[in-house]
Amino acid sequence: AKDGYYVQQITAPTILDFCFAPTVRLLYSNARIGANAGRVALSRGGLIYALETQGAPSIHALTLDSKSPIVYQDGCLLAAGTCLQGGDHLYTTAPPKAVPCTLRFIPFCRRLNGKEDQMAVWVRTTD
């Protein structure tokens, strides 16, 4: 390989199998974009992924552990995170509990396929 190219002499009947395993990347926006401050987006290949709530009380209660591995499985990305759980009161003097959970991200282009869960592309992180 040289300069990003691979050169190979082949003769017929040669079969070439290519397997590209795209890596998951964390994307950070400029800090001047206030709505995305302290948040990341996930991409794999050419796709951007959106976080699903999966029964969590709110998309805002979920936080991604950006230091843990992110696994590609069945077309989705799975990652460790936390879900903030509080009581029924809107305000309290006790902090909410941060319960470990698995976060599920689906390709953004599939986000409107039948589910009514809340979704977010830009997700809070533990950083």
Listing of model-derived features with the role each one plays in the protein:
Residues 1-9, 26-32:
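Solvent-exposed beta-strand/loop surfaces of large extracellular or lumenal domains
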Residues 15, 19-127:
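C-terminal beta-rich recognition modules with glycine/proline-rich loops and embedded aromatic residues
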